[in-house]
Amino acid sequence: MRIACRPSRIYYIHNFIWIMTEEQAFDLLTRVMYETRKNKRYGGDSVAFEWCWSRKLVRMFDALMTKEFRVDNNYAFLTSYPKWREIFATSFEGRIADHLVCDLLRPYIELELHPRTFNNRVDKGSQAAINQVIEDIAEVTNGYHDDARVIKWDLKGFFPNAWCSHMEICFNEVIEKYRQDIAAEYGDDIPGFLRWLAMICIHCNASNNCELRTPQGLWADHIEPEKSLFSKEPGIGVPIGRLTSQTGMGLYINDDVRWLNDDCGIHTTVFMDDGVMVVPEWQHEYALSLIPELRKRLEAKGVRLNDKKFYDQPWRNGLEFLGTHINPWRLHLNDKTYNRAIERIREFNAIEDKYRFIEKFKATVNSYTGLLKNRTEYRRICVLRDAIAPEWWEWLEWDNRRQCIVSKPDYSFCMLLNRKYNLKLKQHDKSRNHRAH
């Protein structure tokens, strides 16, 4: 798609002149926009933005180049699963700004983060963190033969108590360290522009510029003041749900992760605010002696350990990490998540007009079977499959090899669109799938 262009505008950024037409501005932000909406395609903000989206992109570009852009259209709500938590989000333009900062800096952030930090990383994630803990146990116990201890710690109010100024410093250090590489890749003035945009995204003061989408009384009933941004002074606390916040919190404690692993020699795995240390029995006292020093290092940044969530047991007793019970030679999804899966299937089974919810039902069930497949949970997968009402099998079928549900050929997503909008989309031809040969 192309948009109409007016004559080139000249944008002055300090002493740097950037000549760009509206069409070039459109091309600049389109890639970031597609990346932003990739996993939020049907969200309300994404749908609203796509009305006159090319015009909105050009308007956003104008605001960025004149440094008038602000992240001030925020909203807050509560989620009760897996526990009550305060979530802040922003408009689609604000999310594009988050992606603009994090995507351009992603290669350099990856170089800076310690390999034992797993949240918001390329080719990492929660399952990779769980696998790392399993590998640490196998290595420290010499193939599950020797004694070892597992120490698990948790950070209390990680996001609401973080200092915005310290997070800004973390981003600035990455930008300054790789300034020459960033300038060579994108332009001489881009490092300064990224510093400014990171500052705008971090210091958005979301609690004072937001719309409440959950009744205010629920905050007092379910959210502790220490875990709410509404009880914090300006400059304290970053919103959960923002990409800059989640990426920045990895940088926030990166020095502490490096200190534990490289300086102290302790096998430590960190995912967001959860940490697991695996130590041999002879090193147990030494590892415990590091906890007070770790506490001091974190308190110097406004973060503290949660004394109620400290776990220290022999490795044979197992542990729960990121919703998974890690036991010797087996993994189990925790009961709360599994029971939620059964509950969600029953909710879909109660719907009368099931045909309208085929794709949503399929995505929901497969998200839970995907969690179970990565663990020793074949029996639970079968129970989950048997909980599906018979009416669904009119349009869906079970794939035994992949352990998930798939649409029957006549009810694939393309066929549903063809029937609804009288289209002529072609269905995927399995005979041309070269990976099957």
Predicted segments with their positions:
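Conserved polymerase palm-domain catalytic core
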Residues: D136, T141-M272, M277-L290, Q313, ...
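Short Gly/Ser/Thr- and Asp/Glu-enriched loop/turn motifs at secondary-structure junctions
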Residues: D72-N74, T269-D273, K308-F310
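Active-site-proximal segment of RNA-dependent polymerases
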Residues: R2-A4, Y11-I13, C102-W163
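A common structural junction motif
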Residues: I175, R179, L294-V303
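Short, conserved non-catalytic motifs in the polymerase core
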Residues: R41-G43, V47, D72-I96, E112-K124, ...
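Right-hand nucleic-acid polymerase module
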Residues: T90-S91, R95, H99, L218-G235, ...
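Amphipathic alpha-helical blocks
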Residues: E50-N73
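Non-catalytic, polymerase-adjacent accessory regions of viral genome-replication enzymes
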Residues: M1-V58, N418-H437
